[in-house]
Curated annotation (Swiss-Prot):
Binding-site residues for NAD(+), renumbered to this chain: 110-114, 134-135, 147, 156
Co-factor requirement: NAD(+); Co(2+); Zn(2+)
GO annotation terms (biological process): amino acid biosynthetic process; aromatic amino acid family biosynthetic process; chorismate biosynthetic process
Protein name, entry field: 3-dehydroquinate synthase
Keyword DNA damage in record: no
Gene that this polypeptide is encoded by: aroB
Molecular function GO terms recorded: 3-dehydroquinate synthase activity; metal ion binding; nucleotide binding
Alphabetized InterPro entries for the sequence: Dehydroquinate_synthase (IPR050071), DHQ_synth_AroB (IPR016037), DHQ_synth_fam (IPR030963), DHQS/DOIS_N (IPR030960), DHQS_C (IPR056179)
Phylogenetic placement of the source organism: Bacteria, Bacillati, Cyanobacteriota, Cyanophyceae, Acaryochloridales
Originating organism: Thermosynechococcus vestitus (strain NIES-2133 / IAM M-273 / BP-1)
Binding residue positions for Zn(2+): 189, 254, 271
């Protein structure tokens, strides 16, 4: 059974299709829910590992339906999320003569999705992109909402564009080959939604015996977790597509999280691990400022630990360097570092007035 979640964004509206084996049903989903046709050449952008597992399924299904699709295989890893790597997509688009009616299919995790979306936003001033996320993090976050981009040496996602996909196809079966560490990273984003938007999701996660392994989760409950997480992202994005206000709430845990990723050269901590530490830090800031209760912060910490995610800053990280990186964050407003702080389970708020000394004290304490 395929669950459809509409993303209502006016002329940029689309659907999220969640269900087993949907990767092989891609042509039927495209025909039913998008205006896209196989008339123009297309690219499938992926990385070697994902292509080895699922490339044949997706390319075969599209080819059988009449699509002219060529793979574009990029190196795996956040450190390759750069303009130089995106140029490889442009080169493939040029060699395959992609035109304005062409489509880019993003088959991979958040890195592939972000780069493919950015390439689609900028090639010929914008062509269609279809997201086929293969990591939990991409399924519940990166593939939804139209944020695309690449990193700059001075900060994460500083170069980018908003470009909504025409369709998001989520096949939970592909998570069978996802490394456990990457599954846990995705669970950080799921917990985020529970903390700042969906109290029912938070309570559902609290009742589950384990959050660190897909195999330990009953399939029906896991689909419910997926659906509620996607719906949370849709609820926010549909109210604020371009992050003029409310959508910034989705950056909970990301202010410090992005700085942690950057200072570790995108190798020492993955995105979810960095966000988990960022949520712990934001929770402590919220308690210190009187916005949140210590009991709620403890409940958040319990979920993060249940997902076997880190809660402290690695001892060899330079906290003063972290503080400097925060000033380059794209969320800085009038030189004030913007934080998303929880006010209750399922609720959060934007805060631009967090004292710098409190941030410093909190980071040093989390490293102790």
């Amino acid at each position: 059974m395929t669950t459809l979640i509409p993303v209502p964004l006016g002329e940029h509206s689309y659907r999220i299709a969640i269900g087993a084996n949907t990767r092989r049903q891609l042509p039927a989903l495209l025909a039913a829910y998008t205006p896209l046709t196989p008339k123009a050449p297309a690219l499938i952008v992926s990385n070697p590992q994902i292509w080895r597992h699922y490339g044949t399924d997706v390319q075969g299904a599209l080819t059988q339906a009449g699509w002219q699709v060529t793979p574009c295989i990029l190196p795996a890893g956040e450190r390759y999320k750069t303009l130089r790597t995106v140029e490889k997509i442009y080169d493939a688009a040029l060699s395959q003569r992609l035109e304005r009616g062409s489509t880019l299919f993003a088959l991979g995790g958040g890195v592939i999705g972000d780069m493919t979306g950015f390439a689609a936003a900028t090639w010929l001033r914008g062509i269609a992109v279809v997201q086929i996320p293969t990591s939990l993090l991409a399924m519940v976050d990166a593939a939804i909402g139209g944020k695309t981009g690449v990193n700059h040496p001075q900060g994460k996602n500083l170069i980018g564009a908003f470009h909504q996909p025409r369709l998001v196809v989520i096949d939970p079966d592909v998570l069978a080959t996802l490394p456990p560490r990457e599954f846990r990273a995705g669970m950080a984003e799921v917990i985020k939604y529970g903390v700042i938007w969906d109290a029912e999701l938070f309570h559902l996660l609290s009742q589950l015996p384990r959050l660190d392994c897909m195999g330990a989760l009953p399939s029906e409950q896991f689909i419910q977790v997926l659906r509620r997480s996607c719906q949370a992202k849709v609820d926010v994005v549909s109210k604020d597509e371009r992050e003029a206000g409310l959508r910034a709430i989705l950056n909970y845990g990301h202010t410090i999280g992005h700085a942690l990723e950057s200072i570790g050269n995108y190798r020492l901590l993955n995105h979810g691990e960095a966000v988990a530490i960022g949520m712990i830090a934001a929770g402590e800031l919220a308690v210190a400022l009187g916005y949140w209760s210590a009991e709620a912060a403890a409940a958040q910490r319990a979920l993060i630990l249940k997902a076997k995610l880190p809660t402290t800053i690695p001892p060899h990280f330079d906290v003063e360097g972290l503080l400097a990186l925060l000033q380059h964050d794209k969320k800085v407003q009038a030189q004030n570092v913007r934080f998303i702080l929880p006010t209750a389970i399922g609720h959060g708020q934007i805060c631009d007035q967090v004292p710098a000394e409190l941030i410093r004290e909190t980071l040093h304490r989390l490293q102790a």
